[in-house]
Amino acid sequence: MKMWRHLDMNNIIMKLEDIDKFYMETGNKLHILRKLNLEVKRGEFVSILGKSGSGKSTLLNIMGLLDKIDGGKIWIDDKEVSSLNEMERNNIKNHFLGFVFQFHYLMSEFTALENVMIPALLNNFKNKTEIEKEAKELLEIVGLAERMKHKPNQLSGGEKQRVAIARAMINKPKLILADEPTGNLDEDTGELIFSLFRKINKEHNQSIVVVTHARDLSQVTDRQIFLKKGVLE
């Protein structure tokens, strides 16, 4: 296994340095992200905004090590991770990152409680009894103490997304990344989801980065960043 390069970033949980990303489209090379630089502090709640096609989701995928970069460096919790192989990247994702997407991706045959437990069971970090106890506590945090035994088809859209948030927290990630988490929800439910993120951020000192097109909802975050033509403003 490669040795990680360390960077003394003190209060920085993630740093992107001179990130370039290209895509090929009908024979044309598109420069999606251009020498992009970003730092996220520990315990910070950050929103990334931009027009459709601005590269917001690409940026979040790069932060989550779901997509590779074409130039630059990525640092997570003072370790350089941009040059790691696939197995090492997966290890970082499992230990340091939590993900929430626009669609909840809950498994229909399992209850809310079981869905939250799955990532921890797969990683085999703890025994099943401990995992179940922590999953119940997380469902209480997101306001679903009475819905633990319900399956996804018995939950509302907002409740499903709250289960997804609890699932993202089960492995105690250093950073939660959320890609348009309110995109499929009505305005009132979207506000509840952002309020929940803020509560988790404040009460648990959880670092969160959320990509959204909803500028009004992003007002509750510590910092708003705008992505335009591959550059942060």
Curated annotation (Swiss-Prot):
Localization: Cell inner membrane
Gene Ontology annotations of biological process type: transmembrane transport
Record keywords, A-Z: ATP-binding, Cell inner membrane, Cell membrane, Membrane, Nucleotide-binding, Translocase, Transport
GO cellular component assignments: plasma membrane
Name the UniProt record assigns to this protein: Lipoprotein-releasing system ATP-binding protein LolD
Classification via PANTHER family: ALPHA-D-RIBOSE 1-METHYLPHOSPHONATE 5-TRIPHOSPHATE SYNTHASE SUBUNIT PHNL (PTHR42798:SF7), LIPOPROTEIN-RELEASING SYSTEM ATP-BINDING PROTEIN LOLD (PTHR42798)
Record's subunit section: The complex is composed of two ATP-binding proteins (LolD) and two transmembrane proteins (LolC and LolE).
Principal place of residence: membrane
Organism listed in the record: Fusobacterium nucleatum subsp. nucleatum (strain ATCC 25586 / DSM 15643 / BCRC 10681 / CIP 101130 / JCM 8532 / KCTC 2640 / LMG 13131 / VPI 4355)
